[in-house]
Amino acid sequence: MASILSKKQKKNEKYTLKELKSLGHDLLTSRSHINNLPLLLTFVSPESPPQFVVESLLSLQSFFTPLLSQLPPTSSSPSSTKTEDPEVVFKAWLRSKFDEFVKLLLDVLVSQQSEDSLRGIVLGTLMEFVKLLNAGRFHSSIYHRLLDAIIHSEVDIEIFLDILTSKYFKYIDVRYFTYISMEKFVKTLEASVSADRTVIENNEAESDSKESLELSVRKIYQVLSQIPPPEKQAEKSQHEMWSGSDESISEKPTDKKKKTEKGDSTLLSPATISKRMKLKFTKAWISFLRLPLPIDVYKEVLASIHLTVIPHLSNPTMLCDFLTKSYDIGGVVSVMALSSLFILMTQHGLEYPFFYEKLYALLVPSVFVAKHRAKFLQLLDACLKSSMLPAYLAASFTKKLSRLSLSIPPAGSLVITALIYNLLRRNPTINHLVQEIVENADEANTEAGEHNESQPKTIKKRKLGIDYFNNQESDPKKSGALKSSLWEIDTLRHHYCPPVSRFISSLETNLTIRSKTTEMKIEDFCSGSYATIFGDEIRRRVKQVPLAFYKTVPTSLFADSDFPGWTFTIPQEEGTC
């Protein structure tokens, strides 16, 4: 193979660019120079200089374009008869050369030796053939081969996506057949994955196949995410076609007679086109989400699926299996799946009986420092907004959040306090969790029974030492939250961070006047951090300036009285007195 390529290169080196232009001109002017066609094809190669490739490409494109409607559908030789028509044989030969030309263009397109400008020209040529080859109908076969070469190439797909997005994805038939091709690629990958599971191979081969699978999955996701979503019929009544005919996305009739009877008269209404686009969009995405996604792609999909996919699906509940499986994984993945699952439950009637149990399990300290904590906390507040929430469930979430407030940063304690405040306002049945101070009741008991001082002391110790809430229990029904109290919130009154203690004090006064207070907006607290708390503190106007008066000038930063029982001496270096 290498010797053949070297011979071609040596043969091509004999021609100059001017001579190459002359060969193309002769081919276009007279049929007698048809032998220039195979010669020009030899220059369409990644090894050829870019200017030679472009010149040959332009000549061959100009030659084939007027003949596309006359070429047979395949390059197979005509049926052997006694009198073969030379014209039929000639057109079959032209078709074989055209197929060779397309194959060479695809090789140049995905070659790592090709320049980006050359790739743009080649891609434009192939898209012109897609437009013209099938007599005004979209030629899906060439387009599928084009996408297949892009998906399975080692070249960065962003180079091709920039061109496709800017020039071609605005046409509805291009998007339509892109979804069809993506679905076919996914089915091929699914078959290869199932085959790999049944065949036991060595570790190197297994790792190579896994890497190639992940690369293909990433490229398919990049293509799907770059395609504009299906447009609603009300937004745009006329759809722009690359092929210029609505028949491109019509169903193919099985009967040849019916096909000829329909002819070019079949025009689809915008509503029908929108329906079929939505159907192909749904099939492509649902089939893609069945693949084993790499973790980075998994997170990207979950972060955007509620905005880019769910609103455009023909039946959003088809995502039920994917989202419930993601929600059951736990950790960050569950947090990211919560938004989409909540949309399916509230807007599309999805029933998920273990939703609140899984949500309860997500309440761990790491959630309050996660990347998507702001969205999660807002969704948490929305999920607990119903006044029909059972008392045990509201109490369990309230108690779980209050316990978390002791072990998270101050910004998290602020948002937790706001969440608890909203829960108490929405669910009057759990107001008993906010108890009076225990010592006051005990003092009243001791005054009434001074003759028996030992018994009240025992009761006091027992009341202060028991909390029936089990923080390790994953089932809210068994947590025992209804028998507990929010002593953690009382602890926050002595928090080291002044904004937290001030916030708790303000809530104590507000809770006594429920009719004149409103729920707190959780989004106002979600973006808090050490930096925002510090910034708010230094911007506060201080009414009293704290001053320190010393009768004598201090000789050290800390006085000895600050460290009773300790003696600090400065060790002297050797050789000094």
From Swiss-Prot:
Family: Belongs to the CBF/MAK21 family.
GO BP annotation list: embryo development ending in seed dormancy; rRNA processing
The entry's keywords: Membrane, Nucleus, Ribonucleoprotein, Ribosome biogenesis, rRNA processing, Transmembrane, Transmembrane helix
Membrane topology of the entry: Multi-pass membrane protein
Subunit note: Component of the ribosomal small subunit (SSU) processome composed of at least 40 protein subunits and snoRNA U3.
Compartment annotation: Nucleus membrane; Nucleus, Nucleolus
Disruption phenotype annotation: Pale seeds with arrested embryo development at the globular stage in homozygous plants. In heterozygous plants, slight accumulation of the 23S-like precursor P-A3. Altered maturation of 5.8S rRNA with an especially impaired processing at the 5' end.
Expression by tissue: Mostly expressed in flowers and stems and at lower levels in roots, hypocotyls, siliques, leaves and seeds.
Protein name: Protein NUCLEOLAR COMPLEX ASSOCIATED 4
Entry's transmembrane regions: 329-349, 350-370, 404-424
A GO cellular-component term linked to this record: nucleolus
Primary role: Essential protein required during embryogenesis. Involved in nucleolar processing of ribosomal RNA (rRNA) 40S and 90S ribosomal subunits and ribosome assembly; early in ribosome biogenesis, especially required during the maturation of 5.8S rRNA. Has a role in the nuclear export of 40S pre-ribosomal subunit to the cytoplasm.
Organism name: Arabidopsis thaliana (Mouse-ear cress)
